[in-house]
Amino acid sequence: MSWAGSKRRQELPEDWELNYRLPVLSAAGWLCEVDGPGCVRAATDVDHKKPGNDHSRSNLQAICRVCHGKKSAAEGVARRRELKARRKRPEQRHPGRR
């Protein structure tokens, strides 16, 4: 994930590295738990399975940089689609149609 211009890191707990990131990576044997296409297997990142600030162990997974980039990109595309759909007016039925 690119941290450039992101405020995401500021939202993480101060003890993120020691009490969240390292235990998650260690428990996974430093291997990617996503194992998607192009996976490099060596986990270097910890990802939130569901976006947000839920830092519970059940919502965290070890992930390689390739899988993390693809997952983050897909989440970004989905979010932009959602926001675009909200901007459209709801389709109105023609008053003469039942």
Swiss-Prot record:
Residues 75-98 are annotated as: Disordered. GO terms for molecular function: endonuclease activity; nucleic acid binding; zinc ion binding. It holds the Pfam family HNH. Residues 41-73 form the HNH domain. InterPro entries: HNH, HNH_nuc. Residues 81-98 have a biased composition (Basic residues). Coiled coil: none annotated. It comes from the Viruses. This is Gene 4 protein. The gene is 4.
